Amino acid sequence: MPLADFHRSDPFTLGIELELQVVNPPGYDLSQDASTLIADVQHQLTVGEAKHDITESMLEIATGVCRDISHAQTQLSAIQQAVQRAALRHHLQICGGGSHPFHAWQRQQISDNPRYVKTVEHFGYLAQQATVFGQHVHVGCQSGDDALYLLHGLSRFVPHFIALNAASPWFDSTDSRFACSRLNRFSSYPDNGPMPWVADWQGFRRLFRQLSYTSMIDSMKDLHWDIRPSPQFGTVEVRVMDTPLTLAQAIHIAGFIQTLACWLLTERPFKHQPDDYLLYPFNRYQACRYGLDGTLTDVRSGEQRSIRQEILQLADRLAPFAHQLKATAALEAVVRQAKSPHSEAQQMRDFIANGGSLSGLVQKHCEIWAA
């Protein structure tokens, strides 16, 4: 399938997608009933959508095009409430978090969708192991060249995005020692990590054509890069975050990304080049392993700073752009989070250390999501 032309979007408009866990009380294992919920709820929604993801324990909710984070919050809240009502009718519960702490990937049923069936043909058991839960944020751009500049600019902050939403320390009933273990599930994918270097949209067209020769890539949806352009929507899509435990956190990270995008495209502070990505895997790993306590290394100077420090140093620079976008509350929340030692991943560990069970942890997450 040829690459679509880049659809011109209003700059800095937003779209948010959240992959949620569908669980069965009282044991709180993953359910295989996403289709039941979707059939119940899809005709009740007046904004956004609820749809399948790759397995039947995953429910994706998504906004439409939003002007600002307040608009996005209104849409997501309405969808959340409709899904909660449907879940109660079917004796199910919903929660956030980047991974379920004790599910068996072998029992996950692939959703009845031709694209997902093809994914299984390509990736085998890796597709079932991808029963993990992420947040994606789309930011509108006016052109393909703007989208490529923004993609490279936001790639500098991938560790920050991972660390702020890190909520998947438990996997396969084991403390992984990672703040975000979710991204490790994709490490065997041939397109894991950053997009290959291209400088402009013309170069991206060539790249997509070359990738299509593999017979694995029919559309942009078949690419699993950390950040990817979405020409059909006219956006850049950031894909590295765990789904957080609360809707508020999902809004805060979206506002932070939107504010960064506004700064990057307005001031053009960087001259992007391929060497920018030399230490990308190492800095990304630090965020996955240690969250906000991870250490970032500057690719040119060798200077090292914690992710917390970088976020706090960015805040003053971003403040006027947050004000412009009506995202000041989101930026302030991110700053508070960077100053706090109580990450979502650590709170999960503390719950278990204080005598809680893994099923009790999922129950708690369901209560948090429903609150």
Curated annotation (Swiss-Prot):
Keywords: ATP-binding, Ligase, Nucleotide-binding. This is Putative glutamate--cysteine ligase 2. Its EC number is 6.3.2.2. ATP-dependent carboxylate-amine ligase which exhibits weak glutamate--cysteine ligase activity. Homodimer. It holds the Pfam family GCS2. One of its GO terms (biological process) is modified amino acid biosynthetic process. It catalyses: L-cysteine + L-glutamate + ATP = gamma-L-glutamyl-L-cysteine + ADP + phosphate + H(+). Belongs to the glutamate--cysteine ligase type 2 family. YbdK subfamily. It comes from the Bacteria. GO terms for molecular function: ATP binding; glutamate-cysteine ligase activity. It is an enzyme of class 6 (ligase).
